[in-house]
């Protein structure tokens, strides 16, 4: 059989590229995860593209879908980014809009027999995602969500000498991962230096106090950056990306083993 024939026999992992018959066969044959990348279109400093969160989440999701014999649904590109709207190019949706969209997408995937799994790349989406999962559960639909970066604490400690100062937003981690995935999109001459501003973490949020606050990002740092992007490298990005894929694949495998 020719290479062309082999390629034609392999179904794509992108849900939207399947036929309706192929999608139904997937869910009839086995419990199948439909992985929905969620991200944002928002400022990531002067050196990274606006779609940084989505770009990383999509790349991780594609790898995970392949290893888990799942599918990737179309990504939810716009997220909850109100705190970045003073920076050019940021596009934000209201939390209620985001929650409603997640609810409807997951309900449709569940109706088609898939296990909805939201693979998130933007911290601002985490709280709304939890609300959406609760709303879905109240209607009898079980969906799952996790952020690719949450399981990386141990790896970050290996890669960066002071991860609490190196990692935040448009930081050493994200810059490294984009250097690995899409190096042509990194404006290396514009990478800012100077580290995390002294106002972060918020000096009023004392250790042990569970206090929440939402502030515009320019109050934290007018450069749009938290962390030390100057510490980034493509090699570090590859290590972090592979770790994100491995940890995310483990999470999806555990999800699929759970009794529905």
Named regions from a protein language model:
Residues 2-116, 123-260:
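Extended, histidine- and acidic-residue-enriched regions that form the cofactor-binding/catalytic faces
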